[in-house]
Amino acid sequence: MLSPKRTRFRKQHRGRMKGISSRGNRICFGRYALQALEPAWITSRQIEAGRRAMTRYARRGGKIWVRIFPDKPVTVRPTETRMGSGKGSPEYWVSVVKPGRILYEMGGISETVARAAIEIAASKMPIRTQFVIAG
């Protein structure tokens, strides 16, 4: 699972996801990509599940680039705990994804294989996505 090696602060505000993605919304490395159409937090487990699904389907052919990284800690309070006494402890990591953001890229394989592999990865995501071709 992906997570930062070290961070400046252990806990973060939740923030809000306004507008569309201004960075990471163009295909840079591969020829085919999976693009987000909705805003969401995508966990490191979901990112890894999508990556594994694509790798398994594409087998040895092609290369995969993961364009998002989970750099936001999500804190969870223990169950049956009373209110107050501070914020919970960091439980897992998420990547803040806005509409237009490229999640995965693929290259070095045919379009039919890439489309099928990316569709499988898309089913692992908690948001609506679309298949994009460079150019």
Swiss-Prot record:
Keyword Kinase recorded: no
Coiled-coil parts of chain: none
UniProt-listed GO biological process terms: mitochondrial translation
GO molecular function: rRNA binding; structural constituent of ribosome
Keywords, sorted A to Z: Chloroplast, Plastid, Ribonucleoprotein, Ribosomal protein
Highest rank taxon of the organism: Eukaryota
Principal subcellular localisation of the protein: plastid
Keyword Ribonucleoprotein: yes
Classification via InterPro entries: Ribosomal_uL16 (IPR047873), Ribosomal_uL16_bact-type (IPR000114), Ribosomal_uL16_CS (IPR020798), Ribosomal_uL16_dom (IPR016180), Ribosomal_uL16_sf (IPR036920)
GO CC, any one term: mitochondrial large ribosomal subunit
Subcellular location: Plastid, Chloroplast
Subunit annotation: Part of the 50S ribosomal subunit.
Family statement drawn from the similarity comment of this UniProt entry: Belongs to the universal ribosomal protein uL16 family.
Matches recorded under NCBIfam families: rplP_bact
PANTHER family assigned: 50S/60S RIBOSOMAL PROTEIN L16, LARGE RIBOSOMAL SUBUNIT PROTEIN UL16M
Protein name stated in the entry: Large ribosomal subunit protein uL16c
Organism: Ceratophyllum demersum (Rigid hornwort)
Taxonomic lineage: Eukaryota, Viridiplantae, Streptophyta, Embryophyta, Tracheophyta
Designated gene of the protein: rpl16
